[in-house]
Amino acid sequence: GETLPLVVALHGGSGHGRQFLWSWLRAVRSDPCILIAPTSSERTWSLMNPEADSQRLHGLVAYAQEHWSIDPERILLTGMSDGGTFSYVCGLQSDSPFTHLAPCSASFHPMLMEVVDPARAQGLPIYLMHGALDWMFPVSVAQEANTALSAAGAKVVYREIENLSHSY
């Protein structure tokens, strides 16, 4: 049978997966996939203790693979704001099941690259989006992420959106 891509979409801080799911409906209707929009275990994603939410996300991927015909080459982790930041944290771990990352309006700490396995970053497709008018995380944060990830060998597509602030 036909395999479908899996998209795991992470909401922003104090958000909820049920609400974030709605922002994806049009895209899913035009480009079919299996979509999971989980809710963080706390008020936001466990940025300081990544294992807490990372293990849950790994479990969701495994569940999806058991129940649907998932394309193993197209497993995307994306997120908005804190969800985007967590997509870096979780998606860059060496045991990550995700084949693609797409952080949006996310924070990125350069120290993160010091704990990333160079083999994990090498060739990893990352679609990085950030609004030029972002008031929460300045666009310079995304520019630094683009530079650091590209230098590590990731295949980064960088998209700075001219009139976008901190939104999706």
Question: Which positions does each model-derived feature cover?
Answer:
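Cell-envelope and extracellular/periplasmic
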Residues: 11-15, 41, 65-68, 80, ...
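Short substrate-entry loop that stabilizes the transition state in hydrolases
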Residues: 1-46, 110
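Short, surface-exposed alpha-helical segments at coil->helix boundaries
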Residues: 18, 22, 54, 58, ...
